[in-house]
Amino acid sequence: MAKKSWIARDKKKAETVKRYAELRAQLKAEKDYIGLTMLPRNASPTRTVNRCLVSGRRRAFIRRFKLSRISFRELANAGMIPGVTKSSW
């Protein structure tokens, strides 16, 4: 599992992105790039990281389920994810 401090840091970044989203859109529409550079770095949506809801892992993230591959496999094998079955042909 990821460290709680990393998970908290990413949540804080996501909150910063939400706070400045409207202002960023306005500055982009006005093409005020100097104004954009004056905003905090964490206000950019590209700095947010997708994390697994179960383990907090950031690598091998499956967007559709918001889980890492490891958590997805464990939950799918246990039958905890509706509609997911093991493939066989």
UniProtKB/Swiss-Prot annotation:
Keywords: Ribonucleoprotein, Ribosomal protein, RNA-binding, rRNA-binding. Pfam families: Ribosomal_S14 (PF00253). One of its GO terms (cellular component) is cytoplasm. GO terms for molecular function: rRNA binding; structural constituent of ribosome. Part of the 30S ribosomal subunit. Contacts proteins S3 and S10. This is Small ribosomal subunit protein uS14. GO terms for biological process: translation. SUPFAM superfamilies: Glucocorticoid receptor-like (DNA-binding domain). It comes from Akkermansia muciniphila (strain ATCC BAA-835 / DSM 22959 / JCM 33894 / BCRC 81048 / CCUG 64013 / CIP 107961 / Muc).
